[in-house]
């Protein structure tokens, strides 16, 4: 495993971690949303801990085996008994787990702030067919613990979106933490219940084209006090409450639209996914995908001429429409695939990781300094909102949403009223 510059990561061990006790052998159907073609892939994330390196590999390996007894489908494989209908075969074959060691401290690599001073391929597992023998889109989860000389460690995780959404993946990782701290069972017991998600006859639309956009990578931090101030402004504007996500996303959409300097009459789009757990009254332990897109489209002039608070109004109205649109989808009152996306430079996609639960995971060494996705692509203009790394207080944006040509104006707008 090659490092960057003088730093090197060496793999110590690898193999399958299987459930610690016998589990049912069965094939479980996935929900409509789980089966969606774009969800058949591994989401990569990085979880950085300041201490615990010596004990972490053994503790987490053992806890993983015990957690898989409760979450036994995750120890299986994705199969496709019928074309277009993937399912999980509960084989107890296990989760890929690797232990590695870096010859540097976390401080040496700036706690893996961007740009990374170690390749992500050294931090998250890419075993290849010769060492794992399972195609990535049929693998449910892979994990790697990398120890650093300072006593800290990094968990690199690859989790198949077909098996769980972000909240479900965090539920499982928290269950591993529960086992690591000696609990006899997870605090939140898993529930399958995939049949409770609607299963309309709507066919997924064709996969969209993916343009190469050559996006810049930008990190922005917003203190809690600043976000609270924006929320207070919205309360004064409307008499209603809003979330930090609402105000930051409104500011983001407006600043990005201004930075793009589009031709008059251009349409700009914003999309994010919202949970429908409350609409379906799902059990707290449900860990499958339970998301639905919230989409907005407006002339660029409208976004630019509105105040940030008026853009918040637009976002909140779209969130309110989501419930109606979801039940239209569930009752097959529409023939359109609501998950069909348009990927062009005028469209932006926002993902909220701030409340999923990854930042609260504790394996007995305290919560992570940072937990977030390893996303940096050149074909989807996207932003991830998540908790700022400790000891910072507030929210971080990981933005891959503008080209270098537009990044200076975008950053200037986002920072112009920061304290």
UniProtKB/Swiss-Prot annotation:
Signal peptide: none annotated. InterPro entries: CAT-like_dom_sf, Plant_acyltransferase. Its EC number is 2.3.1.-. The keyword Zinc does not apply. It comes from the Eukaryota. Coiled coil: none annotated. This is Acyl transferase 9. Keywords: Acyltransferase, Transferase.
